[in-house]
Every structure is written in C-alpha cells, then in structure tokens.
Curated annotation (Swiss-Prot):
The keyword Disulfide bond applies. It is found in: Virion membrane. GO terms for biological process: adhesion receptor-mediated virion attachment to host cell; symbiont entry into host cell; symbiont-mediated suppression of host complement activation. Residues 70-179 are annotated as: Disordered. This is Envelope glycoprotein C. Changing K154N: In strain: Scott. Its main location: virion. Belongs to the herpesviridae glycoprotein C family. GO terms for cellular component: membrane; virion membrane.
Length: 591
C-alpha cells in the first residue's frame, strides 16, 4: 500500500459541510467508497435546496381565479430561490419535474442500475476500471453519462421550458407546490349583533367591501375610497379606473321592520316579530330603487344610503331612530346572474324612550269613591309598561282598576291606569294611602322601576246659609277647609269686590275644618235685589256650594210706614179711651 496525499476539497450545501484533508494510506476501494458517499450527500443537498417555494400572487391576479388565470408572457418566470433563469433552461423543481428517459436518474434512491453494471450496493460494488478514480470536485463528467447536478445539467430539447410560477400541474403527477389563493369579496361592518339606540337619535352603520383570500384568510382593503387603478385589459399603456367589486356581483341592503307581539313575552323581554323585508339599496341596474318611487321615497326620507356608483363604502345612516326604522339591516354581496349570495352581514337596531311618570290622587267628598291616577307618558317600545296598585291593605284587585293606552303620531305611547275604591265607614278617616308601582322594560337586559304613594283628599259637605241681620246680608259656611276656601259675593248676577270673612268656630263633625261667616251691606234702591254667596277654593270637580237671598228695599219701607200708622192710631185710640174712662170715673165720684 502506497501513501497518497489527497488535495483538500469541500462539499457545501444547505444542510452540511464536509471537509476531507490530509495524507492517509487508503486503498483504491476505500477511496471509491468515500467518493460515492460524498456524491450521494451532494445530490441530496441539491434536491433540498431546489425545492419549490410558495408562489407569490400579484395584485393584478386577485380578480382572476386560480383555475382560469394564465401566466403573463411579459413576466420572466422566477424560482423560489430567486435565481435568474436561463431562457434555454427550464427552472423546474426536483420534486415536481418528470425524468428524461435519456437522462440517468440522479438520486441514489431512485436511479435504475445500468444493465451493464452488476447491481451491487454502494458499499460493496467495485469501481469500473475504465473510470479514473478522481474526486467529485475535480473529475470531468462522462459524455455518456447525464449530468447529475441541477445547476449544471442541460435541458432536454424535447422538454418545454416552464417556470414554477406559470407551469400547469399534471393531474397524473404528485404536485407538492402550493396553489394560488382563491379570492372572494366580503362585506364587513363595524357594528354587529343588536344595537340599542335612543329614540330620535341618528345612527351610522359603517360597512365596507373587502377582499378575502381563502388560503391566507386575510383581509385586503382598498386604500382608495371607491375605485383602484389597474391596467387596461386590452394591454395598452393607458390606465383607467376599475371597480373594486367584480362586474358579476352587486350589493343589496335589506331592511326588516320588527313588530312587537303584545301576547308573547319571554320573562321581561319583549318578543319582536319580523315584518316583510324591504330593499333599501342596490347598485344593480336591474334593481335600481329609483325606478320604485315608494321605496325610494322611504329610503330618502329616513336614511342616507350609498351612491349607486360606489364600490367600497356601503355605509347606511339612520337619520332619526323611531318605530319605522327599528329592525334588522342586511348587507348582501349577490351574484347578479345566479342570484346566489356570496356573503352577508346583518345588524339589528332597537330603540327606546324613557317615560315620564306622575301619580295624582283625586279629591273626593265624604261618602264618595276614592280615586287615583298613574300616568306613564311618552315611552317606547310599546307594551313595555307594567302597572300594579297597592294600599296598606295589600294589592288592589283588578276589578277596581281601569287602564287605557294612547299612541301618538311620532310612534310614542302613553299609559294611564286609574284605581277607584268605594269608601267604607272604617276607611273614612284617615283616607287610605294608595301606591302605584311601575315597571318599564327597555329591553331584555335593562329596565326601570318607579313607585309613588298618593293620599286622596276627602272633604265634608259644607253647610251654607244666608240671611239679613241688622241691615246686612250675612252668609255662614260650616265645615270648610281652613285657609283654602273664601267667600265670593254676587249681586244680581254680577260679582262685587267685597271681602269680609271671619272664622267663627270649628266643625262639629271634623275638627280639621272650621266655620266661617261673611256679610254684605244691603242696597237702598227700590225693587228686588238678589244676593248670592259662593264658596271658592274647592276642587273644580266638586259641585258649587252657594246660598241666595232676595231683598227689596221699597217693600221694606212701605211695610214700616203701615206699621207706624197702625201703631199711631192704636196709641191715639188708647189715649182717648183712657181719657173717657177717667172722665166717667170723675163724674160718678162727683155725683
């Protein structure tokens, strides 16, 4: 065995580095074995480094499906490793290219043995004496043997040079490269689910068209508001505007109004039943809403809808939330030809208005029915108010309660509940305290509770009398409220400005009330004069309390003169009679 000195050589690849250097005593068989191992490792690294990479998709390919897109002849095919291809060389990946029958397989695992060579393993087969034992780095390729390196082999003239980005997959081949992403257009809105907006408020629903790739699952939104630049499809250098939405698609906006069913309720939540859907917007020429005056007028008066030429911003603005604009809004991307819905987005909008609640008690007279009223005014949604009456004796029965609901022109509602309780002897005083309990259901989550207590005012019937005392007309009222009631005098159906009243005592039946008296001077005019005394200050629903007296000054004077004459005559006759009696007695005495 002779001592040989081998030159230094390196095998470099993406996965390993090998370096053999030194002077060793080896046999020819051992040297050939090492060379074969190095060749196998080199071929494996070349195969790994030339694997195909995912093919990037340009923005111009976004509107073309993967099944129909053709390669741009003006674009040079490039491999994933960014090498510049030789026009004569087909840049195909090792994983997907078909072997040339005239080329020997380059992989140790896949190449077929030469019939002229005995099928021996790499570890045991003997080298060909006709082949000089040279290293892999320095040996020259055999003209009869096809080059085994992807970087150095020449293409087969029978094979068409194709790029990795443009070649069509062979159905029979096991293709491993990634397919271009599938593109579809999607409508996306800022809001979603259920939105609760106050009554009469403005609500904006921003919605935009976006491009979605199925493979990358990413959104690509256009930077421009309506349209984007693209090359003219005829291939000229002139640029023009191209719509973001595909020409075979169009956008529709539908509205379904909600109607509340008063007979259905889930807990405190109101059941809203959908009405017939109405189309508010469409940018399709076949469905242009301008041709439908009724729908177009409704949309124009209640909404700000997108322009028919827009291709990106499909936002809708509700000018004023009310009963007519409450419901579900649906945006749909529709295929114009097949009518299939590509994508859709819905927003349910509800509205509410907080009510104003007042509770008042109705004043009554002793013996009349107690009454109280609970007024829940201007609320929304309808059928969202619950009223319950209670007193110190418990819940008040429904047979004493009367309810009434009124709807206003603007869609709001009012609810009036009245309770009437007959008086009983044991309830005359003090009067019962009546409580109104209100529950307003805004939606299935929020509600408001309100309660108020009212005590009816009970008044006894006043006793009013009138007469003349010492030349004055005197009016007396018994059992009237202190500081509330005052006297009003009328003479011959005309009010007079005369205030003269005083408290003379307390009411015998109820010490909370007093007795009062007022007087008015008589007139000296002849003829009958009517004096009336009215009690002012009682609730308007009470009947009037008054007393009337007629006085005639001339009749009073005539009556006085006749009486005076009669008295004078009687006095004279009496005097004469007395004189006659005295004279008679004197005559008798003298006799």
């Amino acid at each position: 065995m002779s001592k040989k000195t081998f030159p230094s050589f390196k095998f470099r690849g993406g996965c390993f580095n090998l370096l053999f250097k030194g002077s060793v005593d080896v046999s020819i068989k051992t040297r050939m074995k090492r060379i074969q191992i190095n060749l196998i490792l080199t071929i494996a690294c070349i195969q790994l480094s030339t694997e195909s990479q995912p093919t990037p998709v340009s923005i111009t390919e976004l509107y073309t499906s993967a099944a129909t897109r053709k390669p741009d002849p003006a674009v040079a095919p490039t491999s994933a490793a960014s090498r510049k291809p030789d026009p004569a060389v087909a840049p195909t990946s090792a994983a997907s290219r078909k072997p040339d029958p005239a080329v020997a397989p380059t992989s140790a695992a896949s190449r077929k043995p030469d019939p002229a060579v005995a099928p021996t393993s790499a570890a045991t087969r003997k080298p060909d004496p006709a082949v000089a034992p040279t290293s892999a780095a320095s040996r020259k390729p055999d003209p009869a043997v096809a080059p085994t390196s992807a970087a150095t082999r020449k293409p087969d003239p029978a094979v068409a040079p194709t790029s990795a980005a443009s070649r069509k997959p062979d159905p029979a081949a096991n293709t491993q490269h990634s397919q271009p992403p599938f593109l579809y257009e999607n409508i996306q809105c800022v809001h979603g689910g259920i939105q609760s907006i106050p009554y009469f408020h403005t609500f904006i629903m921003p919605c935009y068209m976006r491009l979605t790739t199925g493979q990358q699952a990413a959104f690509k939104q256009q930077q421009k508001t309506y349209e984007q630049y693209s090359l003219d499809p005829e291939g000229s250098n002139i640029t023009r505007w191209k719509s973001l939405i595909r020409p075979d698609l169009h956008i529709e906006v539908w509205f379904t109004r909600h109607l509340i069913d008063p007979h259905r309720q889930l807990g405190n939540a109101l059941i809203r039943m959908p009405d017939l859907p109405v189309m508010l917007y469409s940018n399709s020429a076949d469905l242009n809403l301008i041709n439908n005056p009724e729908i177009f007028t409704h949309a124009k008066e209640n909404y700000v809808i997108p322009d028919v030429k827009t291709t990106s911003d499909f936002s809708v603005t509700i000018l004023s939330m009310d009963a007519t604009t409450e419901g579900t809004y649906i945006w749909r991307v529709v295929n114009t030809k097949t009518k299939n819905v590509i994508s859709e987005h819905s927003i349910t909008v509800t509205t509410y208005y907080r009510p104003n609640i007042t509770v008042v008690g109705d004043p009554v007279l002793t013996g009349q029915t107690y009454a109280a009223y609970c007024n829940v005014s201007k609320y929304y949604p309808p059928h969202s108010v619950r009223v319950r009456w209670t007193s110190r004796f418990g819940n008040i029965g429904k047979n004493f309660i009367t309810d009434a609901i009124q709807e206003y022109a603007n869609g709001l509602f009012s609810y009036v509940s009245a309770v009437r309780i007959p008086q009983q002897k044991q309830m005359d005083y003090p009067p019962p305290a009546i409580q109104c309990n209100v529950l307003w259901i805004r939606d299935g989550v929020s509600n408001m509770k309100y309660s108020a207590v009212v005590t009816p005012d009970v008044y006894p019937f006043p006793n009013v009398s009138i007469g003349i005392i010492d030349g004055h007309i005197v009016c007396t009222a018994k059992c009237v409220p202190r500081g509330v009631v005052h006297f009003v005098w009328w003479v011959n159906d005309s009010p007079i400005n005369h205030e003269n009243s005083e408290i003379t005592g307390v009411c015998d039946q109820n010490k909370r009330f007093v007795n009062m008296q007022s007087s008015c001077p008589t007139s000296e005019l002849d003829g009958p004069i009517t004096y009336s005394c009215h009690l002012d200050g009682y609730p308007k629903k009470f009947p009037p309390f008054s007393a009337v007296y007629t006085y005639d000054a001339s009749t009073y004077a005539t009556t006085f003169s006749v009486v005076a004459v009669i008295i004078g005559v009687i006095s004279i006759l009496g005097t004469l009679g007395l004189i006659a009696v005295i004279a008679t007695l004197c005559i008798r005495c003298c006799s």
